[in-house]
A protein has these predicted regions:
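ABC transporter nucleotide-binding domains
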Residues: 2-4, 11-205, 211
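Short, well-ordered coil loops that connect the C-terminus of an alpha-helix to the N-terminus
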Residues: 15, 103, 121, 224, ...
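Generic structural signal for individual residues within well-ordered alpha-helical segments
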Residues: 94, 109, 116, 168, ...
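ABC transporter nucleotide-binding domain
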Residues: 171-258
Length: 301
């Protein structure tokens, strides 16, 4: 069964069409990436799922039934904007928010303490929200989203403010929840996280879908037009404008997107001529970041 299904959903604000005829479905127990540039309509879409906004056209189904006022109880929502009461203590905030989702105080208190320990905040249980760093507040907000054990999670930029260690911790918990049957809708600008976590994606721009489907199939469809290179020495051998369209450096490697019809062997020849030691030279599928840029750029051309 699909956990979520949108059919031709449209939302307007006066003369502005924020979302137009958007359709996608998310099977239960999967991680789905809702992607797009700033202002694309992602947050409006998430708010329609949460019934904060009502579509002007189209339909939304959640867990096999039309969305209604009970739908938010089945969803844990981590918004991009902070939604915590700054003068309340962590425990008080979590118990209060969990009670709104139907948990008893005892259930909420027990669950809150367990999650706080899991996220290394156990000693902060009686601290006020405004005493916490941004990263710590983000972890509390994540707990608020998962505390009532919802079957569906909507996480809008969940890694904001987190250092690499805590980002990895949240990622591992998200995958653990997925393995336990939760459906996760992830909205983020961090394409590397999408590649590691998402089963399928929908890329929207100006409120319209421009790319959707299983992530692996999408990457295959773009072909192996990228060379991943690891080398020691000067990188001037990559200054080949007739061959190289774009460079994407990460760590010790560089991804080189080839121009249409270009021969990757020209890069290798240039490296040898410059005396550069190549330790990796491999044709790979393009990273999602490159696909994102290409599709959005072509839409706005």
């Amino acid at each position: 069964m699909d956990a979520v299904r949108l059919e031709a959903v449209t939302k307007r604000f006066n003369t502005l069409t924020a979302v137009e005829k958007l359709s996608f479905s998310i099977p239960e127990g999967k991680v789905f990436g809702l992607l797009g540039p700033n202002g694309a309509g992602k947050t409006t879409t998430l708010r329609m799922l949460m019934r904060v906004l009502i579509p002007d056209e189209g339909s939304i189904e959640v867990l096999g039934t039309p969305a209604d006022d009970r739908t938010p109880d089945a969803i844990g929502y981590l918004p991009e904007e902070r939604g915590l009461y700054p003068r309340m203590k962590i425990r008080e905030v979590l118990v209060f928010l969990a009670a709104l989702k139907g948990l008893t105080e005892a259930e909420a208190d027990r669950g809150a303490r367990q999650w706080l320990e899991r996220l290394e905040l156990g000693e902060w249980v009686n601290k006020k929200i405004n005493d916490l760093s941004k990263g710590m507040q983000q972890k509390v907000q994540f707990i608020a989203a998962v505390l009532h054990r919802p079957p569906i999670l909507i996480l809008d930029e969940p890694f904001t403010g987190l250092d690499p260690v805590n980002a990895a911790l949240i990622k591992d918990i998200m995958l653990e929840l997925r393995d336990q049957g939760s459906t996760i809708i992830l909205s983020t600008h961090r394409m590397e996280q999408v590649e590691m976590m998402c089963d399928s994606i929908c890329l929207i721009d100006h409120g319209r879908p421009i790319l959707a489907g299983e992530l692996k199939a999408i990457k295959r469809s773009f072909g192996k037009n990228t060379v991943r290179i690891e080398y020691t020495g000067n990188g001037q051998f990559l200054d080949l404008p007739h061959v190289v369209e774009r460079l994407n450096r990460h760590g010790a490697a560089v991804d080189v997107k080839l121009r249409p019809g270009a021969n990757a062997q020209e890069i290798l020849k240039a490296a040898v001529a410059d005396g550069v030691e190549i330790t990796r030279f491999e044709l790979v599928e393009p990273p999602l970041n490159d696909i994102f840029i290409e599709k959005v750029s072509s839409t706005n051309a």
